Curated annotation (Swiss-Prot):
SUPFAM superfamilies (UniProt xref): UDP-Glycosyltransferase/glycogen phosphorylase (SSF53756)
Highest taxon above the source species: Bacteria
EC number(s) on file: 2.4.1.182
GO biological process: lipid A biosynthetic process
Keyword Phosphoprotein among UniProt keywords: no
Pathway terms, separated by semicolons: Bacterial outer membrane biogenesis; LPS lipid A biosynthesis
Protein name in UniProt: Lipid-A-disaccharide synthase
Record GO terms (molecular function): lipid-A-disaccharide synthase activity; phospholipid binding
Reactions catalysed according to its record: a lipid X + a UDP-2-N,3-O-bis[(3R)-3-hydroxyacyl]-alpha-D-glucosamine = a lipid A disaccharide + UDP + H(+)
Role noted for this protein: Condensation of UDP-2,3-diacylglucosamine and 2,3-diacylglucosamine-1-phosphate to form lipid A disaccharide, a precursor of lipid A, a phosphorylated glycolipid that anchors the lipopolysaccharide to the outer membrane of the cell.
Record organism: Persephonella marina (strain DSM 14350 / EX-H1)
């Protein structure tokens, strides 16, 4: 049985990676894992929850942990690993690809960094250290055209997000299980999965919820949380005077997706969750706030007009983005109420989100990816 190392640095990547692992049962898997990968049987070198960061300033407290995790990962590459699969997380994974390539280990970039948005300088390194890049956007292959060779392949498979999005509850059963009255409408709050995001964004979202609730007492707010952040979320939410539920995988198999599906409106932190929410078709606001230094550096590096994937795909702002100073309780409440109280804006947004979903291609990206990886491992 071939042994594969898989490296994931974010919760969204954990979703995709766990499905990929399940589609490749003939490999023995070890790596940097999230909860779903561990559930799928991947042996853990380090939990991604311990090294996941966003932004330069936010990364500093975890620097030594990340460095130590990298050292241990390289040591494992020396112990008979046949294949390395990495998912996004370029600051860490590009270095790991380089070490694998030195050792003659076959390498796969499954869900590559968004170099079309920022970090185009990484393209030569990605091509140098990667045997197979699995592209999830139709335009990605063109980006790498000048680098494709016998030692670097790029294959487009479609977006795996369509394979992993699943829900099990009706609106009625969802409300019943968390004790929400039938006539109440659900308002989703998704502050992100990283500790730094939750600590920054959740207090803002909850203060906004208090403003919204004063005008809309028919709402019940629901926060889906990862298990490792549940206590933090409940502690932050404890003092707020709005109808509020915090749910995790202990309550539902797919808590975030249930909230996305059954909410009349949502406030969503920038990231993969914005694309997931778009697929369910319910209008939402994109919110984000990082340190001024991180934001300044990001603005210098990014070559696109929007932060949210739905807006990038649409080529215009179909979802309002409230960033940095605009990400405050008053602005979030004002924009949320505008969507909720203007049927024309609400329906237009739903129609725009349906077009975004259609642009993602067909289901089956996970199986197509698994087939490509099998082929590489046998070559």
């Amino acid at each position: 049985m071939k042994k594969a190392f898989i490296s994931v640095g974010e919760i969204s990547g954990d979703n995709y990676a766990s499905q990929l692992v399940k589609a490749l049962p003939d490999f023995m898997w070890v790596g940097i894992t999230g909860p779903k990968m561990r559930e799928a049987g991947v042996e853990t070198v380090e939990k991604l929850e311990n090294i996941s960061v966003v932004g330069l300033m936010e990364a500093l407290p975890k620097y030594f942990k990340i460095k130590e995790t990298f050292k241990r990962s390289v040591e494992i590459l020396d112990k008979g690993i046949d294949l390395l699969v990495v998912v996004d997380f370029p600051g860490f994974n590009l270095k790991l690809l380089k070490e694998a390539k030195k050792r003659g280990i076959k390498t796969v970039y499954f869900i590559a960094p968004q170099v079309w948005a920022w970090g185009k300088g990484r393209i030569p390194k990605i091509a140098q250290y990667t045997d197979l890049l699995i592209a999830i956007w139709p335009f990605e292959k063109e980006i790498y055209t000048d680098y494709i060779s016998d030692s670097f392949r790029v294959e487009y498979v479609g977006h795996p997000i369509l394979d992993i999005i699943k829900t099990e509850e009706t609106e009625e059963s969802f409300k019943e299980k968390i004790g929400i009255e039938k006539d109440k409408k659900i308002f989703g709050l998704l502050p992100g999965s990283r500790e730094s995001e939750v600590k920054t964004l959740l207090p803002i979202l909850l203060s906004s919820a208090e403003i919204i609730y004063r005008k809309r007492e028919d709402l019940h707010f629901v926060i889906p949380s990862t298990p490792n952040m549940e206590e933090n979320v409940k502690q932050i939410a404890g003092s707020k005077k709005v109808p509020l539920s915090v749910i995790t995988v202990k309550d539902f198999r797919h808590p975030s997706y249930e909230v996305m599906k059954h909410s009349v409106f949502l406030n969503v932190a920038s990231g993969t969750a914005t694309l997931e929410t778009a697929i369910f078709g319910n209008p939402f606001l994109l919110v984000y706030k990082v340190s001024p230094v991180t934001f300044f550096i990001g603005k210098m590096l990014v070559s696109i007009d929007y932060l949210g994937l739905p807006n990038i795909i649409a080529g215009r702002e179909i979802i309002k983005e409230l960033l940095q100073k605009e990400c405050n309780p008053e602005s979030i409440a004002r924009w949320s109420l505008r969507y909720l109280e203007d049927p024309e804006v609400y329906e237009r947004t739903k129609n725009d989100l349906e077009k975004v979903k259609k642009a993602l291609g067909e289901k089956g990206a996970i199986k197509r990816s698994a087939d490509l990886i099998k082929e590489l491992s046998l070559s």
